[in-house]
Swiss-Prot record:
Cofactor: [4Fe-4S] cluster; [2Fe-2S] cluster
Family: Belongs to the radical SAM superfamily. Biotin synthase family.
Protein name: Biotin synthase
One function term, GO molecular function aspect: iron ion binding
Pfam family, one: Radical_SAM
Name of the top EC class for this enzyme: transferase
PROSITE patterns associated with the record: RADICAL_SAM (PS51918)
Subunit structure: Homodimer.
Organism, scientific name: Methanocaldococcus jannaschii (strain ATCC 43067 / DSM 2661 / JAL-1 / JCM 10045 / NBRC 100440)
Residues where [2Fe-2S] cluster binds: S142, C174, C233, R309
Record domain Radical SAM core: where: 47-306
Function: Catalyzes the conversion of dethiobiotin (DTB) to biotin by the insertion of a sulfur atom into dethiobiotin via a radical-based mechanism.
UniProt: [4Fe-4S] cluster binding residues: C65, C69, C72
Listed PANTHER family: BIOTIN SYNTHASE, BIOTIN SYNTHASE, MITOCHONDRIAL
Amino acid sequence: MIFMEIETFLKKSLKNKIDFDDALYLYNNFSAIDLLYLAFKIKNRIKNNSKIKLCAIINAKSGKCKEDCIFCSQSIYSKCNIPIYPLKSKKEILEYAKKIIDECSKISSSIERGTLIGAESPNLMDVGYPNRGFPLWVERFSIVTSGKKINDDEFIEIVEAIELIKEETNLKVCCSLGLLDREKLKELKKLDVRIHNNLEASKNYFKNICSTHSYEDKVKVIKEAKKLDLEVCSGGIFGLGESVEERIKMAFELKELGVDSVPINILHPIEGTKAYEKIKNGEIKPISVSDALKLIALYKIIMPYAEIRLAGGRIYNLRDFQSYALMVLDGLMVGNYLTTKGRCLEDDLKMIADFHSL
């Protein structure tokens, strides 16, 4: 019975015809493994290969954010002990990007010498991108700043940083700079930059996670970016007390906006944030491994032609089951996050190589 239904929903997804009722039915009646299998078949029908696109970020401006997002350690309303600093210089941003390339080079050398333990699979070399004699496993580099928006001087510095990165590396550049106006978006379009602006939650649930800016503020930026033919990366953060229905609603809202890439973040509660206190007090129930995997699979089923990438909270929430998500993912964020530590690139590459060898 499940097999027949999988074939039915496979055909429907490939035609981009999955609706809300379908998605809710799948969540309620299919196991996480069954949903992953369905999403895996969808991904393989669409893509000629299963290469996982890796991206990394720099926290280019940290803390002192006047917004009150309940999950964020950079908000002035949180009590977190995090690094606080103004916008890094263009040279500092460039050097950070170069460190990522250097790390790829060192890993490549270790593979060639046979000293990278656990990387016996030849697929590890295959999942990279050609780059001056060695694979560049990290495809994208995103410049992220705290705050609702950046000022004109900060924007100029970031533009110059992007120009340097493009001149001196093969990295594709993304920017997460808050609420950008049309003129700034037009400048970024000239630089072939992908814009990042998370919805964070569904339209109906957004009021529960932030009051200092609106869901509509974010949608306005995304729509303006799409009008200018910019690529847009937009997703959300899950595990903030939202219902399954709200998670599914956001998928359809993102689909309607026509975003190109959808990052899935799962709450990693940080002591000092409002979300942490809500979990501690029992107001929010942490997301389970099964629910997280169902969510990832459903987003691929609902949006088969968008890039689904796993970002913040994957280590904390999926633990030993991260590799299961690789069945359906198009992308993965590697390295450190904004204020939390990630895994080293080498460990993630080993995980990907092991998956590709199955």
